[in-house]
């Protein structure tokens, strides 16, 4: 998922904007007096950004990738794509999602939507042109696995929890700086405001490590689902083809890379912020699974 990721940046922006708004309205001076009410208050704002993003995810995905939804197939490839997704969805026990193709040379695909029965699965033009039918089917099975596992909803809920505690502990830190260090006894001063914003940025980046860890775990689960639906050898073959094309630039919007099959490759500390495990690790996990 992401290069210091639009998804993370969006959530941090929500927190910062919320903090500025609360300061300007003077609300913080009341919520900061009681930790119980503060936690509830932060939960409302913390979940707002992630849940709004979840509910508009299909619309945003279509707009940002210029995905063309297949309503009436015009070619045999589109007909095959619809039939394959329909078959995989039926086997996974979910409602047929919308199916689309987005114009990109790199081989990639993504799934999104606010619930498992109102989803979108889209593949890149490059994937359809260069991958074999078995490999494309395995990629589609992986994305159907994301939908069937409810990964989009779970990720949004985890992000909401993370946002809540980032806002909560940032305000506790801001209050400590304002009262204990700056000795401000007259409401919340500028020290509280600056310290809170600083803490939100730092804690938000640290907390994103938790979100990225979960994202990597769910990739393994989606690979397992793909192997169950399309066969282990086909799933491994698709991942090997993706590995062969790993040097190609990825043009998918950062907000959707978390839900694509092919993630960015990072090493060292940057690996903590990867949305996907390495393709080598994913292939090895499938081989061990048998």
UniProtKB/Swiss-Prot annotation:
GO CC field: plasma membrane
Compartments where found: Cell inner membrane
Keyword entries, A-Z: Cell inner membrane, Cell membrane, Hydrolase, Membrane, Metal-binding, Metalloprotease, Protease, Stress response, Transmembrane, Transmembrane helix, Zinc
Cofactor(s), names only, from the UniProt record: Zn(2+)
Classification via InterPro entries: HtpX_protease, Pept_M48_protease_HtpX, Peptidase_M48
Principal EC category: hydrolase
UniProt-listed Enzyme Commission number(s): 3.4.24.-
Pfam family of the protein (one): Peptidase_M48
Transmembrane regions: 4-24, 36-56, 150-170, 193-213
Active site: 143
The keyword 4Fe-4S appears for this protein: no
Cofactor binding note from Swiss-Prot or TrEMBL: Binds 1 zinc ion per subunit.
Protein topology in the membrane: Multi-pass membrane protein
UniProt-recorded Gene Ontology molecular function terms: metalloendopeptidase activity; zinc ion binding
Primary subcellular site in the record, as a coarse category: membrane
Origin: domain of life: Bacteria
Positions with a binding annotation for Zn(2+): 142, 146, 219
GO biological process: proteolysis
Family indicated by similarity: Belongs to the peptidase M48B family.
NCBIfam families linked: PRK05457.1
Descriptive protein name: Protease HtpX
Natural source organism: Stutzerimonas stutzeri (strain A1501) (Pseudomonas stutzeri)
Species lineage: Bacteria, Pseudomonadati, Pseudomonadota, Gammaproteobacteria, Pseudomonadales
